[in-house]
Swiss-Prot record:
GO terms for molecular function: RNA binding; structural constituent of ribosome. The gene is rpl30. PROSITE patterns: RIBOSOMAL_L30E_1, RIBOSOMAL_L30E_2. It comes from Dictyostelium discoideum (Social amoeba). Gene3D superfamilies: 3.30.1330.30. GO terms for cellular component: cytosolic large ribosomal subunit; extracellular matrix. PANTHER family: RIBOSOMAL PROTEIN L30. This is Large ribosomal subunit protein eL30.
Amino acid sequence: MVSVKKVKKSQENIGSKLALVMKSGKSQLGYKSTLKTLRAGKSKLILLASNLPSIRRSEIEYYAMLSKTTVHLYSGNNVDLGTALGRHYRVSVMSITDAGDSDILTALNAKA
């Protein structure tokens, strides 16, 4: 069993890496634009909020499997993911196309 402190620390660590991606990298926020990047084969990592509806989640995972892209389930809900990205709105799906200065791709074992 993982302690609450360790989970919170790893969530803060991912949050700081996400903030660096938003500042120095390239990403797409939202369901439709994420599907576009997956179909084009540009995505390197997909982040999904924990409260994403299952039909959308399965569709994104299907396209990610076809394009051999890593999918990471964010431990917080869409409000938490939006806050971690520095946005004042909810974000359920995020596609990272270029990580910039962040090492989030290696930390979450995505393709570089």
